Amino acid sequence: LDRSSAASDVYKRQGKDSSLQTIRDEIIGMNIFNSVFVDCTASADIASLYKDFLQHNISVVAANKIAASSAYENYRELKTIARQRGVKYLFETNVGAGLPIINTINDLIHSGDKILKIEAVLSGTLNYIFNKISADIPFSRTIKMAQEERYSEPDPRIDLSGKDVIRKLVILAREAGYRLEQEDVEKNLFVPNDFFEGSLEDFWKRVPSLDADFEARRQVLEKENKHWRFVAKLENGKASVGLQEVGANHPFYGLEGSNNIILLTTERYKEYPMMIQGYGAGAGVTAAGVFADIMSIANV
């Protein structure tokens, strides 16, 4: 499904009941061997169907990160059902679009390695914003630019709140063998909490009031030859997300545009962490990642 209402629209045109239950029953009723349900929505309702599909021997490929970042017991149950039924629940594109991050972590774990630390820039939107901010382009304008370039959500507060990054970090931590909930992640945000209240229109009216403070801080940063990066970190089982200042010798310093980067420190890669870097957002690379998951099932 390419959006939460896509199947419903088809059913309505055919004069059929368009409820989730009908969609579920029809897909299961097809009883097609080696079938795959692909979810490219951001719908919690669609994600709630995964359990039934897996129990009926239907593999699930999800760009939708809601299920994998939901309550740990739900995540664990989906993985367990998939294993018991001999089908796949794959969600590589939940983190880093088409970058091979989750598969790499799985390969390390399955080969006997242990993930000691994860440090990453996982928001293409926020990286774009902090790469664009300058003396000529104030903070509020960079947010609008990210929206115009379709990097951000229609409501950019979703990106600025760090919620999307928290979900991604939770997914990576779980795949690395850590039991983590979204509520366990420490947040160090750069926009005051009251900016996330009220209407979107109110937000756009108020956000220019932050420009002067950001410019003053940016000037200090420039003199120190540092860059801002919104970093997700997992170490010793503790997780956090927040804005950091990184110097020229840091691997995150030169990260361009809306790219993502992840450093994996493991028992094997302890002195020199494994680094994965590249496009972390965009329809093309995300579609390629979804297709790769589908093909990995087709080739089983």
Q: Which positions does each model-derived feature cover?
A:
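Rossmann-like NAD(P)H-binding beta-loop-alpha module
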Residues: 83-86, 90-149, 163, 171
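Catalytic, metal-anchored helix/loop core of enzyme active sites in primary metabolism
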Residues: 117-122, 127-130, 145, 151, ...
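General beta-strand structural signal in soluble alpha/beta enzymes
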Residues: 36-39, 60-63, 89-92, 117-120, ...
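Substrate-binding/catalytic subdomain of NAD(P)-dependent oxidoreductase enzymes
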Residues: 132-133, 141-254
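Single conserved hydrophobic/aromatic residue that forms the stacking wall/gate
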Residues: 1-7, 11
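Rossmann-fold NAD(P)-binding glycine/threonine-rich loop
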Residues: 44-52, 65-91
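Rossmann-fold NAD(P) dinucleotide-binding segment
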Residues: 17-62
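Conserved active-site and cofactor/substrate-binding residues in soluble primary-metabolism enzymes
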Residues: 18, 32, 73, 96, ...
